[in-house]
Amino acid sequence: MTAARPRVLIAPVTVTPTKALGLSHLKGLLWVDVMYRATRSLGDCDVDYLYSNTTFNVTRQTAGFWEYLDRACGNIDLSAATEGDVGLLYTAFQTQSDPPPDAALLPYVRAVEQTGWTHPVSRRLLELWRGHFAWLGMHDPGLTRRQPPQLAFNEVVEQLAKHDLCLDTRKEGGPVYLDATAQGLPLRPLTSLTGHPNYLGCALRDLLPAVAQYDEIVLLHDRELTQDYILLHKLFDALGGARTHRVCLDRVPLDGAVRSSRHGVGHEHTVTGLAGELRTYATPQAVRLGMRLYFIAGLGKGENGQSYRQDLLRQSIDRAGKLLAREDSPQAPDAAAFLHQHTGSRNHVDAYRLTSALLRRHQQVPLRATATTVYL
């Protein structure tokens, strides 16, 4: 009898369609893309890429922004808005002195839950992002597709309660808490005081059932969310089932400082800005490989705090062009064997180890074969 193929879920933080894609977003998306495509190319496991805007469109970050647009910008024609235009509005939304109550978001939440509705401004952004994904050769995980979460939030609460992992104080006018105190972690609210689920509460609507459906779950997140993702890791271990791995990425510093997109980002530090600078700089293949060499192997996970440098990005693109111009050596291993070298004891490929290996000077590497499958 043939053993079942391992099932792997790659689950990054979903970028909400409320602002321009910046360099930190790009780094994470490239990292996930390489991991997903390389793991899929192993051929010995089934891999899924969880990225659902539908799940997170009910959060205050997104639904609240939509409410702000309709209330404060209703007379502005945003049908042809650029990412920069939307980014400025998002900054204004984040700095408003009197945020609306959760009740004001309910019409938007209902529309998302019942029909998968997306505000026209976010639809506009997602179409622009699809263009970025196509330019960079990234797999589209369903940016504009309706992808309802597997569980209703109340079902999440019920399942957590069965395992004594939840403290529900809604009847007393408080939030729902994720309770991992038995694992030595503090209570973490999953909702507001009025019961509106936050980002973590929404994430569990897809991730909680995945624990029983997959053999391995890879959680990718930025460092600012580390405590929440340690909590998820502990939660999944307590539930049993899938082995869980975390990949923590630092945001990309600009001149030594990490800046949040909620405070605005300069055009030159967005994917749109990079596209304007690099679209004619080199061949599309060199740009795609070079971007991955820089944002994955060059910057790494980010522990060294290296700031973004356009000159080094261009050097990586130049190097990518030279590497792609060479024929693979007959002595190089085949691409599948090369990919397997960078899994360790896990079912997924380590994007950093694989990408760094392409730059080895004294080892035979099937670069063109690997690039065609994973990087282009």
Locate the predicted segments by residue:
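NTP-dependent nucleotidyl-transfer catalytic core
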Residues: 1-376
